[in-house]
């Protein structure tokens, strides 16, 4: 009950400050996934397993915050944006952490990576680094949206927001390119079908991180135009 009152006070001050707190945990989740990926590429399964567990724990925290925020937003709260818009954005932002957790689960499936070529591992690592960028940009975007609101929708602050949104879209496009390159390598290589399926699912869940980041950026664009 005490925590719910805290969230309500934050929502009363600004509808975006609680979302910023949730975004912080989302970023931590993806950052931890990158550490898991580094250990995975080195063949350090036990260390990777530790980081994968932390990813799962952080995703649980993000889910808990999401539930608390959802329960705290009531129709009685006076906010400059619709309750449904806040909830839709929160849902999309939370999906970023979900995608990170899905990736971590796939990493755990295979212990020995001797059959996975280094060029494939390198692309997966690049996708991981770009995913971090996407998550951090989402965090910057929701913080900037708060600045836009506090400035009374000043043109200078709006331009900053659109710049961040464009950066998110660019990162998502870059990851799509890496994903396509990876698929080409997998289908032209002599990988065992199980290894191919394993790699493609890691790539798919990694791509979902940037896809969900782009979705949140689009939601921010909608909020800006309302």
Curated annotation (Swiss-Prot):
Gene3D superfamilies hit by this protein: Phosphate transport system protein phou homolog 2, domain 2
InterPro entries recorded: DUF47, PhoU-like_sf, Put_Phosphate_transp_reg
UniProt superkingdom: Archaea
Similarity comment text for this entry: Belongs to the UPF0111 family.
NCBIfam families cross-referenced by the UniProt entry: TIGR00153 family protein
Record's protein name: UPF0111 protein PH0637
Organism annotation: Pyrococcus horikoshii (strain ATCC 700860 / DSM 12428 / JCM 9974 / NBRC 100139 / OT-3)
């Amino acid at each position: 009950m005490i925590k719910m009152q805290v969230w309500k006070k934050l929502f009363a001050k600004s509808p975006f400050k609680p979302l910023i707190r949730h975004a912080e945990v989302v970023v931590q989740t993806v950052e931890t996934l990158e550490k898991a990926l580094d250990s995975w590429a080195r063949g350090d399964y036990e260390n990777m397993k530790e980081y994968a567990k932390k990813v799962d724990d952080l995703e649980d925290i993000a889910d808990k915050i999401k539930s608390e925020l959802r329960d705290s937003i009531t129709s009685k709260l006076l906010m400059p944006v619709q309750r449904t818009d806040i909830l839709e954005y929160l849902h999309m932002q939370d999906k970023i952490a979900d995608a990170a957790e899905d990736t971590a689960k796939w990493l755990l499936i295979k212990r020995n990576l001797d059959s996975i070529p280094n060029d494939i591992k390198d692309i997966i690592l690049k996708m991981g680094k770009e995913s971090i960028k996407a998550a951090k940009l989402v965090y910057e975007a929701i913080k900037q949206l708060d600045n836009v609101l506090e400035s009374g929708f000043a043109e200078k602050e709006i331009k900053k927001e659109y710049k961040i949104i464009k950066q998110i879209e660019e990162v998502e496009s870059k990851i799509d390119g890496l994903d396509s390159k990876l698929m080409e390598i997998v289908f032209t290589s002599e990988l065992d079908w199980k290894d191919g399926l394993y790699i493609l699912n890691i790539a798919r869940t990694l791509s979902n991180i940037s896809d969900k980041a782009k979705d949140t950026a689009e939601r921010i664009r909608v909020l800006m135009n309302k």
